[in-house]
Amino acid sequence: MTLNLCVLTPNRIVWDSEVKEIILSTNSGQIGVLPNHAPIATAVDIGILRIRLLKDQWLTMALMGGFARINNNEITVLVNDAEKGSDIDPQEAQQTLEIAEANLNKAEGKRQTIEANLALRRARTRVEAINVIS
């Protein structure tokens, strides 16, 4: 038995295929989803989506927050942005992380600090999506 996973952003369909299992980052921690999972709707945190493909290979995806619905072996993940780990340029991601860290260090005031922290979380997630060992 398999799951049908659909990952959507406002601009495109990132993934729409059958999978064996996923591990999803939610606002209350990671959840694993196997076939016949109980129905659930949950907020999706900035984090990694791990997808176990039908050939037992693992694929990673960086998700930038949103929500997910699981029902009758159908998983729909709606997020602000998503990138497959294999599509992320490692050098660009590392540079973005370094810039985000520098921006956090020089942030002044609450608003700049919050925005810099959010940018740093996004940058770390992109780097993590590249470096996850399958």
Swiss-Prot record:
Q: Which CDD domains does the UniProt record give?
A: F1-ATPase_delta (cd12152)
Q: Tell me one GO molecular function of this protein.
A: proton-transporting ATP synthase activity, rotational mechanism
What membrane topology does the annotation report for this chain?
Peripheral membrane protein
Listed GO CC annotations: chloroplast thylakoid membrane; proton-transporting ATP synthase complex
Q: Where in the cell is it found?
A: Plastid, Chloroplast thylakoid membrane
Q: Which UniProt keywords apply?
A: ATP synthesis, CF(1), Chloroplast, Hydrogen ion transport, Ion transport, Membrane, Plastid, Thylakoid, Transport
- Family classification: Belongs to the ATPase epsilon chain family.
Q: How does it assemble?
A: F-type ATPases have 2 components, CF(1) - the catalytic core - and CF(0) - the membrane proton channel. CF(1) has five subunits: alpha(3), beta(3), gamma(1), delta(1), epsilon(1). CF(0) has three main subunits: a, b and c.
**Which protein is depicted?**
ATP synthase epsilon chain, chloroplastic
